[in-house]
Amino acid sequence: MARWIPTKRQKYGVAIYNYNASQDVELSLQIGDTVHILEMYEGWYRGYALQNRSKKGIFPETYIHLKEATVEDGGQHETVIPGELPLVQELTNTLREWAVIWRKLYVNNKVTLFRQLQQMTYSLIEWRSQILSGTLPKDELAELKKKVTAKIDHGNRMLGLDLVVRDDNGNILDPDETSTVALFRAHEVASKRIEEKIQEEKSILQNLDLRGQAIFSTVHTYGLYVNFKNFVCNIGEDAELFIALYDPDQSTFISENYLIRWGSNGMPKEIEKLNNLQAVFTDLSSTDLIRPRISLVCQIVRVGRMELKEGKKHTCGLRRPFGVAVMDISDIVHGKVDDEEKQHFIPFQQIAMETYIRQRQLIMSPLITSHVIGENEPLTSVLNKVIAAKEVNHKGQGLWVSLKLLPGDLTQVQKNFSHLVDRSTAIARKMGFPEIILPGDVRNDIYVTLIHGEFDKGKKKTPKNVEVTMSVFDEEGNLLEKAIHPGAGYEGVSEYKSVVYYQVKQPCWYETVKVFIAIEEVTRCHIRFTFRHRSSQESRDKSERAFGVAFVKLMNADGTTLQDGRHDLVVYKGDNKKMEDAKYYLTLPGTKAELEEKELQASKNPSVFTPSKDSTKDSFQIATLICSTKLTQNVDLLGLLNWRSNSQNIKHNLKKLMEVDGGEIVKFLQDTLDALFNIMMEMSDNETYDFLVFDALVFIISLIGDIKFQHFNPVLETYIYKHFSATLAHVKLSKVLNFYVANAEDPSKTELLFAALKALKYLFRFIIQSRVLYLRFYGQSEDGDEFNDSIRQLFLAFNTLMDRPLEEAVKIKGAALKYLPSIINDVKLVFDPMELSVLFCKFIQSIPDNQLVRQKLNCMTKIVESSLFQQAECREVLLPLLTDQLSGQLDDHSTKPDHEASSQLLSNILEVLDRTDVGPTSAHVQLIMERLLRRINRTVIGMSRQSPHIGSFVACMIAVLRQMEDSHYSHYISTFKTRQDIIDFLMETFIMFKDLIGKNVYAKDWMVMNMTQNRVFLRAINQFAEVLTKSFMDQASFELQLWNNYFHLAVAFLTHESLQLETFSEAKRNKIVKKYGDMRKEIGFRIRDMWYNLGPHKIKFIPSMVGPILEVTLTPEVELRKATIPIFFDMMQCEFNLSGNGNFHMFENELITKLDQEVEGGRGDEQYKVLLEKLLLEHCRKHKYLANSGEAFAFLVSSLLENLLDYRTIIIHDESKENRMSCTVNVLNFYKDKKREDIYIRYLYKLRDLHRDCENYTEAAYTLLLHAELLQWSDKPCVPHLLQRDSYYVYTQQELKEKLYQEIISYFDKGKMWEKAIKLSKELAETYESKVFDYEGLGSLLKKRALFYENIIKAMRPQPEYFAVGYYGQGFPSFLRNKIFIYRGKEYERREDFSLRLLTQFPNAEKMTSTTPPGEDIKSSPKQYLQCFTVKPVMSLPPSYKDKPVPEQILNYYRANEVQQFSYSRPFRKGEKDPENEFATMWIERTTYRTAYTFPGILKWFEAKEISVEEISPLENAIETMELTNERVSNCVQQHAWDHSLSVHPLSMLLSGIVDPAVMGGFSNYEKAFFTEKYLQEHPEDQEKVELLKRLIALQIPLLTEGIRIHGEKLTEQLKPLHARLSSCFRELKEKVEKLYGVITLPPSMTERKPSRAGSMVLPYILSSTLRRLSVTSVASSVISTSSNSSDNASSRPGSDGSILEPLFERRASSGARVEDLPPKEDSENRISKFKRKDWNLSKSQVIAEKAPEPDVMSPGKKTQRPKSLQLVDSRLTPFHSPSPLQSTALSPPPLTPKATRTLSSPSLQTDGLTASVPPPPPPKSKPYESSQRNSAEIAPPLPVRRDSKAPPPPPPKARKSGILSSEPGSQ
C-alpha cells in the first residue's frame, strides 16, 4: 500500500496560486504563502503554512514553487530556514508584515500613510527583484543594501514598528553575539539616523532651509545639474549661449561657462544634442551655497554680420553681443526648491539697437535706458542692473531649463545620480578649488579673462571695431592645438576670437576662457593676444591686418607660476612678421610691470632695452586665475623645495613656510616633507634647524587636520609608512618635544607646544616609524635605552606639567589629556606595553582631584579604546585605576559628577570585557562588580528619567549583570559585611528594577534592547530570589518588606507590556518566542514557588498580595493561569485558618475590588472566568470546611466576572450608550447586593455620566439619588468611598447630601420632572429651616420651588411614548438575549424613529413584523431578531389625589410617569368569519407588562418581569368603542362650551364622522351582530351588555344635540352648507335612535363653566362610565323632562344635579383601585377594560370635577351608593326613585374600569388611524379628514396633522360657570 514519504530536499516553497481547501484534510493557500513541507505523495505535499504552524494539511505539488532552505533540528521538531541572502529574507518578512498593516490603513481610511507605504512597498519589491537577479556588481549591491535597509528602517518607524539594529554593513545584529553596550549604541545610532531622515523629508515637504543646513553639515561638495530644454528667440543667425553661475553681490562668476551652440533654425547646431543638453556645475562648496544670492546667467552672442539687417556683401562670422538672460537660483541652491522635473523659464533681454546710440556701446536691456548704462560700462554692471530690474519685457523669448542640486563631488554625483549624469553630460568646474581637495584630483586649469582695452583710432575718424584673437604658443612659436576652452560641452579651440563691439574706443569684454596645458609644457608656454579691426564690409575686412599684439608668459623667472589677478599687458605694434615671431617678442617685457622694471634697469644701463615707439599708446588688461595641483605661485615654498641650491635661505624659507597657503602645501606634500627631513638629517649639526623643522612639521600636520584637507590624511599616512626613511629622526623629534614639554612654563613656547600636542599623533607616528626603521637597519643596539628613556622622560615631563596649579597652562594640560592617548598604539610597537600602562597610570594620578575632570575621564576612555587595554596583563594595571576614578565620580558625595564622560568610560570598559579575543575577563568583571555595581545602581536610582545619560547607565548596569556569572552573584552577596547591608542592597535593586520596568528608559520600538534588559533582569531577580529563600526565610530572619518588594517586582516584570506576546503581530510574536521564549512563564512559576515557600508568613501578605497575584493569573497564558490560580485558594485557606474569624472576608473583598479594576483596565476574558471558577470549585470542594462558602464564592466571582466582561465589551466595542448603561446597571446591582458601597458609587457616577452625555437628565437625577440615599442628614464625617468622583469639598454627610440634592434638583428641572424636584426641595427646605438654619438658602430654594409649581401648570411638557422591545436569538449579549424590555421614548420620539435607532445599534439584527411572541426556533437561532411595538402606560394615581378636583396639568404627569404597568392590544378573529359583518368575530387580545422598576428611573428601559394576556369579546369591544366615541364627543363639547375661542374645525369633523351616514354608516353593524334574537339565544349571559350598548347609543344623542347646537353658534359662512347637512342627518339619526333605544336628556349644568382658583384651570370631566350611568341611573333630578306633568317634580331640588356625578368623583379619584361594591364577576372585565382603554392616547387636559360630596351619598359613615336605575316609559327614559336592590342589581352597569384615567379632548385624540397595538375603530370606515389627531385651534378640517403637534395652552379663564362637562382646550 502506498504511503506518505518524508521529504528530504523539498522542504520549503511558496504558493504561486490560490488554493481553496474543499475538505478538512486540505490546507487553503493564498499566493505568496510560504509552506514548510513535511511529506509527499503522488503529486501532493503535506505540511503547514509558516504563517499558521498549528494547521497542517495537504496541497497540490503544482501549486508550490520550491526554494532552497536549510533544515535545523531534523525530525519531528524540524525548522526550515530559507537559503536566501539574509537581506532578501528580511525584505520578504518586512513586506509580509507591511502588507497586513497596509490593508488596515486602507480600511481605516488613513490615505496619506497608505500611499506612503504603497510607494515604499513598491520600491522594496523592485529592489528585492534586483538583489535576487544576482546580476549586480559588488559595489552596487552594497549601495543597494544601504538603500534597502534605510527604507525598511524609515518605514518601520513610520508605522510604529520595532527598530532594527544593524552593524556597519547593514546586517541585523544578533543580541547574543553583541555586547550590551554595542547593542545600546547601535540603537542610538539607528534611531538618530532614522530621525534625521524623517526630518530631512519633512523639511523637503515644507521647503525649509533646514534641509539645506542638514546637508551642508554632512556634505562638503555639491554639483548643480542643469538640463537645457529650449531657447525661444528669433535671431535669424547662429548664436552661442554661455551659461554660468554668478554672484550678483560680489559681481563675480563662480563657475566656468557651459557653452551651447544654437543654429539659426532654432535648434542646436549639432542635431544629436537635441533634448540632450545637460551640464553639471561641480565643486560647489557649502560656502558657495550659503551665499545670499546666486544667479544662473546666460550671455547670448550672435555669430554673423555686424548688424542683423546687413546683406550678403557684409562681413560674416563676427561674434556680436545680443542679450542676456538671468534667473535667481538661490532657492534651489539653498535647498528650498527641489524638483528636477519642473521647467523654469528664464526671460531673455535683447540689446537695444537704436540708431541714435550707434556711436556708443550697445545697451543690453530694453528696460535699462541709454543714459543709465555708460558706453564703457563693464558687463558685470549690465548683468547686475538686469538682475535689479524687477520686470522683464521678454515678449515670450527666453530659455527653458530644469535644475537640481546634487550633493557630492563629481564621482559621487555620477554614481548616485546616474539617471541624470551620464557620459554625455558636460562638466563645468568651479573657478577655484572645492572646499575639500582630494589627493587624486589632478588639475591644471588656467582661466584667462579679457577685461578691457583702449585702442587709438589712428587715421580713422571713428573708434575701431576691435576683435581680440587669443592663442597659446610655446617658446619656439609653435601653436598649441585645442588648448583654449571657451566653455564646457565642446572640445578646445586653437584660437579664440572675442566679441566685437561697434566703434567703441574702450571695449570691455569680461570674457573668460580656460587654457588647459600639460604640466610639463607650462614652463615653455605663453599666451598671445592679437588685435584686429573688423570692418562690416567684407571686401574691406579682408584687407585688415592685425594692428597690435600682446603676450603673457605663464611662468615667472623665479620658477613660480603667473600670479592670480589682473595684468596690464603691453600692446606692441609694428611689422606683422616680427609681431608673429615668438623668439623676437619674448625678449620684450610682456606686462607693464615688467616694462617698468626694465625701464628702471635701462635708466641705469641705457643700452639694455629699446622698446617699440608705439607700444605704450594702447592698453590691454587681462585677469588670470590658476587652479593647479602641480604649479605653485609661492616663491617661499619653491625656495624650500629647492633648498639645496639656496642653502643660505633655509632658515628664512622654513619660517616663511608657516605663511604659505595650505592648498599650495598639500599639492607638494611629499616633496615638502622630504625637504624637511632632508634638512633635519643633513644639517644635524645645527640644532636651530631641528626646532624649525619640528615647527614646520607640526604646521603641516595641523594643516592636514583642517577639514578642507582632511582627505590628505591617507596621503600623509602613506608617506609615513611607504616613503619616510629618516632613521634618526626619532632622536631629534623626541628631543625637541621633550624640550617643549619640559619648558611649558615659558610663555614663548606655549603656542608651539599646544600646536605640537595637537599634532602629537602624527609626530609620534614619524618618531615610531623612524625608530622601527632604525631597529630594522641596526638592530637593538646600545641606544635602546636612550629611546626608552626619552619616552619615560616625556611622561615625567607631562606628570610635572599636570601637577602644576590649574591656572597655569590649563590649555596645555587639556591638550595633553586629549592627545597623549593617541600615541599608545604606535608607542606599543617599540616600548614595553606593561611599562606604558604604568606610565599612563602615573600620568592620570598626577592630575589633582577635581581638576579637568571631564578631560581626565575622556583621556581614560581613549586609553580603554586603545589596544593596550585589550591585553589582559595591561588591564591588570589599568583597571584598578579606572574603577577608582569612576568610583570617585559616581560616589554619593561627589559634588558635580560628569555623567556623560563617566558613562562613556564605563561603557567602553564593559564593551572590551565582553569580547572573547581579549584574554580572561572574569576577575576584571568581578572587580567592576565589587567596586562599581552599587554605585551604578545608585546613579540610576538618583538620575532623572529625562536625563540624556540614563540610557547609557542602564546599559552599563545591564552589561555588568549580564557579564556576571552565577559565582559572581554569590560572591557579591558574600562581600557585604552585615545582614542589613544585604537587605539595603536588595531593597535598592528591587525598587530600581521595578522603577525601570514601570517607566521604560528605552523607547518602545527598541525591542531588542528592551528584551535584553528583560532577560538580564529575569536572571538577576531569580538569583536574588535564592538569596531571599536562603537568608530571609525563617521566623527570626524574615523580612516582610523585602519579600513584599520581591513579589511586587516579579509581578511588575511579568505584566510588563514588552512581554505580552498576544498583543504583538504574529511575526513579532514568533520572533520573540524563538529568541527569548515566554519569560512570563518562568517568572510566574517562580512567583508560585516563592509563595508556597512562605509557609506561615503567608497571612502577612493577605490582602496586600491579592491584587498582584490576580495580575499574574490574568496573564493570557493557560499554563501560567493553571499554575497560579490555586494561589487564591491557598489564600482563602490561609485566612480561614489563621485569621481567627473562620472566614476569608479580607481576601474576598480585596479580590472583588481588584478584579473590578483589572477587568475594567482591559484584562481577563471568558476563558479566565471559566478556568477561575473551575479551579476554585475543584479545590474548595475537596476542603472540609470551605466546601460551601468556597463554592458560593466561586460562583459569586464567576458572576461578577460575567457582568464585568459584558460591561467592558460594551464599553470598548459598542458605541451604543444604551448597552453601556445596561451593563453598568448590572454591575451596579451586583455591588449593591454585595454591599460594596465604594465600587457601587464609582459605577453610579459612570452611569450618571452616560446619562448626562445623552441628555437623559431625569435618569441622571434618579442615578444620583441612589448615592444621596446612602447618606444621612447628620454631621457624621464622610468616609472616603462615599465622596463622589468629582467630589465637592465637604466634610460631613449632610454637606454632601445637600450638594447632591441641589445637583439632582437641577437635573430634574432640566428633565421637566418638576414634581420630583418639588418633593426633594421640600426635604431640603426642612433641613435648611430646622437643622442648619440657612434662611438665605431656603429663600432661594423656595423661589425655585415656586417656579416649579408654575411650570407644572403653564409650561409645555410633551408626554413620552413607551415601546416594548424583544431581543430574540443567541446573537445578542447575555443581558439582552430572549428578554423583553419596556423603553421610555425621548421627547416627541415616534415608534419609527425609535425602531431606526434600535436597528442602528444592532445593524445585523432582523426586524420582526409580527407582534406575537416568537417560537423556540427564533429564540435559539444564532441570529439577532428585534421586535418593537408601542405600549400604553397604565396610570397609577397617588392616593392623595383621591376624591379631589385635580387640574388636568397635574394629572398629565401621572399618565406617563410613576408607571410600572403597560398594555398592548392586538385584534384577532375567533370563530367563523361573517362576510356581512366582520365586527361580530373581532376579538381583542390584551397583553399587560409589569416592569422590574417604576418609570422613570435610573434607566430609560427596564425588563418586563411579569407578562399576562387576556381576551376581550367583540361585544365588550363594541361597548368600549362606543364609550370612547361618547367620551370624545363629551370632551369636545365641554371644551367648546368652556372656551368659545377654540377653532370649530375639529368639532365639525367629529360631528360629521358620527352623524353623516355617508361617512359613518350608522350602528347597523352592532345591530346585525348583537341586537338579534339569535345572538341573545346563543349568548344569554350577554343580555346586560347588549342593553348597555343600546343605552350608550341612546346616550350619544343628547351629546350630539349639544354639539350641533354649539356648532350652529360658532358657524361661519363657509361652514353653512356643512352645518345644514349635519342638521339634516342628525334629525334622521335622532329619530331612529329615540325610536329604537329611547331618550336620554343631559342636565343643563353639563355644559356650563365652573369657577376656578386663579392661576389654574379645573375642568370638570365626564368619564364614559359616568355617561354610561346616565343611561341607566334613575335620579329624579338628573333628567330634564320635556313632559310638563312629570310624576316626581318635587324632587328636582337645587343642587341635586350633582347627584349624577357623585359616584364619579370617588371612582375617578381611585381609578387604579378596585371599587369595593362592584359585583365580583365583573372583576376580570374591569381588568380587561382597563388595559384596553389605556391603549388610547389620552388627553392631556383631563381634570377632576371640583365638587363637594352630597351628604346622603358621600357621608363618612356610608358605603358608596350604587348607581340607580332608569326605566323605559313610553319609549322615553323617565326618572323615578327606587332604592330597590333588585332593580339596581338587574340594571347595574359593567364594572368601572380605569377609563377613569382617560380623556379625549380633540387636540390629542388618536382613535383613528389605529395601529396593530390598539383595537379597530367602529365598523364604518373613516375618511382622511376624520382623524382627530390634530390641533384643535388652527388646522382646517381637510388637512391631517402630525399626531404629536401640540398647541400652547391658552390663558386661564377669567370666570367659571357651573357645569359638569367641560374641558381645557389645547392643554397639553
UniProtKB/Swiss-Prot annotation:
Domain SH3: 8-69
Localization annotation: Cytoplasm; Cell membrane; Cell projection, Podosome
GO MF terms, alphabetically ordered: GTPase activator activity; guanyl-nucleotide exchange factor activity
C2 DOCK-type domain ranges (all copies): 443-627
Residues modified as N6-acetyllysine: K818
Primary site of residence: cytoplasm
Biased composition (Basic and acidic residues): 1704-1728
One GO CC term on file: cell projection
Modified residues (Phosphoserine): S365, S1755, S1765, S1771, S1784, S1788, S1832, S1867
Compositionally biased intervals (Low complexity): 1681-1692
Tissue expression summary: Highly expressed in lens, where it predominantly localizes to anterior epithelial cells, and is weakly expressed in lens fiber (at protein level). Expressed in brain, eye, lung, spleen and kidney, but not in thymus or peripheral blood leukocytes.
Region (Disordered): 1681-1730, 1742-1868
Feature: compositional bias, Polar residues: 1796-1810
Disease per UniProt entry: Defects in Dock5 are the cause of rupture of lens cataract. It affects both eyes and is inherited as an autosomal recessive trait. Homozygotes spontaneously develop opacity of the lens at 35-60 days of age. The initial pathological changes appear at about 35 days of age in the deep layer of the posterior cortex as irregular swelling, condensation, degeneration and fragmentation of the lens fibers, leading to rupture of the lens capsule at the posterior pole at 45-100 days of age. Following rupture, the lens nucleus becomes dislocated behind the lens or occasionally in the anterior chamber.
Similarity comment: family membership: Belongs to the DOCK family.
Name the record gives this protein: Dedicator of cytokinesis protein 5
